[in-house]
């Protein structure tokens, strides 16, 4: 079993070997998986008691996901700006508002010059920063990152880790990163 308390605004890394349950933990916190036993409370809400509809709302507004594989984060036929807008289609009707927010998020992650680039025109690190902007699109309280630096070189890895620290400090967002190193 596991007993874990993560405070609001905390930056935390869960480190362990492959198969140790790191991604499963992240998926449970994200409302994507349910355990066979136990309890999980996020912001005072019992995730395991939520209906499917409540879980959808939780995932839309409480958590943002960054996956290791960029293919899970980005649509290849859309620009960075368009990709970041995708999660907003369900909540923001005004196209100008979506575009402005997406642009601002891309600037926040250091990609002002890549707003009109397609994923195939970006490096792995740039794609991962677009993925972080996507995860922030609906102002989540918690940012969940599953091996976010697993597919990039060490210099880019350091830059992405610094970005998570910056977002944690500037936005006060809780950041949970799982990694094997």
Residues covered by each model-derived region:
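The feature captures the beta-strand-to-loop junction immediately N-terminal to the Walker
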Residues: 15-17
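Conserved ABC transporter NBD signature motif
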Residues: 38-46
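Short coil-to-helix segment of the ABC ATPase nucleotide-binding domain corresponding to the Q-loop/switch region
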Residues: 77-85
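Conserved ABC ATPase signature
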Residues: 118-122, 126-128
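Conserved catalytic motifs of ABC-family nucleotide-binding domains
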Residues: 139
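Catalytic Walker B motif of ABC-type/P-loop ATPase nucleotide-binding domains
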Residues: 143-146
């Amino acid at each position: 079993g596991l007993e874990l308390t993560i405070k609001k605004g905390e930056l935390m890394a869960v480190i362990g070997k492959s198969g140790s349950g790191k991604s499963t933990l992240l998926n449970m916190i994200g409302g994507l998986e349910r355990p066979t036993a136990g309890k999980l409370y996020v912001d005072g809400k019992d995730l395991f008691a939520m209906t499917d509809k409540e879980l959808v709302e939780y995932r839309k507004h409480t958590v943002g996901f960054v996956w290791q594989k960029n293919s899970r984060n980005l649509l290849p036929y859309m620009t960075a700006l368009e990709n970041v807008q995708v999660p907003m289609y369900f909540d923001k009707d005004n196209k100008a508002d979506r575009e402005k927010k997406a642009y601002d998020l891309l600037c926040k992650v250091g990609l002002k010059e890549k707003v009109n680039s397609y994923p195939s025109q970006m490096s792995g690190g740039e794609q991962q920063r677009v993925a972080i902007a996507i995860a922030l699109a609906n102002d989540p309280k918690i940012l969940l990152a599953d091996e976010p630096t697993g597919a990039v070189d060490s210099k880019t890895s350091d830059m992405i880790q610094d970005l998570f620290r910056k977002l944690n400090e500037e936005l006060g967002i809780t950041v949970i990163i799982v990694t094997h190193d």
